[in-house]
């Protein structure tokens, strides 16, 4: 996986007319099937130049010969040199956007857990960086970033020298990482004692399993929806289904819920939720945990009298590929139907989806179909999308959606 010799000609690509149009419209991906000409074989992470049919400069991107997503666009417009200053300016632009939301990178305020780099939408395609207090978690989704890893570490070390950096890898590149002596969960800069980090979100303390947890250790993308739930929880009995480590549960408790139930099939997740409550002893709400399959548990309790005033349905992705889309849409409807059976009159249903293959319109219609079948009157409180640190700059990056409904 070495870089090509310096004497090798620049890697040049020509792409289909449709791909040209997509690039000009700001889309950051070029698929293998769209490459029409290539002057030579390329190595992972090479900077390849894309030309249009008239031999005019179109883009520069990261090349990955092992992925059907062959090129991830870094720059379009006029030709430029992607030197150290270019990379530094791009990172600083992303950090400035976060500073407007959370303060400087090295500040420790009410929220020191957030997304620092959101892949393509921040101009770093195939790379995300999340911050948890004094730890940065860098997750790679393409082998094209391996040759640039040292550069990224140097850039962050110059801006946050006391932070540790943990490397996380998508499954598809783990084997190639091993060839380079890298592995998922590896501390590649600084020091980290243990596998977990305690960070703050809106003043609440949470534990993130940064070396082996889901995503980068916590579901940071639901922060704004957690805040919304907090504002709706006073005096309510709250059910947090697919609770994972209890994010919604803690916000509901701080919002004045009378009791909160965290429901998840994973005993490990429920233990994590209990640890997070222990980190926040000021929360007075009764917290219960239930280990069960949500799809089975919700309808099984119909008519039991164990009703809730606020039900949160936040499952993991139900469609990881396009072939699973129709089944996921049906599953979202089934979940909403089950949640409604446990929702008391006047209660609030919060349904969320993180499946990129299911559009916001398809998801909301699945939920609303279940609502209409229930025969209950309803009022839509709001629909929500991405948090500002998880902004999406192109259609495929839009995955998160939620709908808040109040039922009679």
UniProtKB/Swiss-Prot annotation:
This is Ribosomal RNA large subunit methyltransferase DR_0049. One of its GO terms (molecular function) is methyltransferase activity. Belongs to the methyltransferase superfamily. NCBIfam families: Rlm_2499C5 (NF033380). One of its GO terms (biological process) is methylation. Signal peptide: none annotated. Specifically methylates the cytosine at position 2499 (m5C2499) of 23S rRNA. Keywords: Methyltransferase, RNA-binding, rRNA processing, S-adenosyl-L-methionine, Transferase. It is an enzyme of class 2 (transferase). It catalyses: cytidine(2499) in 23S rRNA + S-adenosyl-L-methionine = 5-methylcytidine(2499) in 23S rRNA + S-adenosyl-L-homocysteine + H(+). The keyword Methyltransferase applies. CDD domains: AdoMet_MTases, PUA_RlmI, RlmI_M_like. Its EC number is 2.1.1.-. The keyword rRNA processing applies.
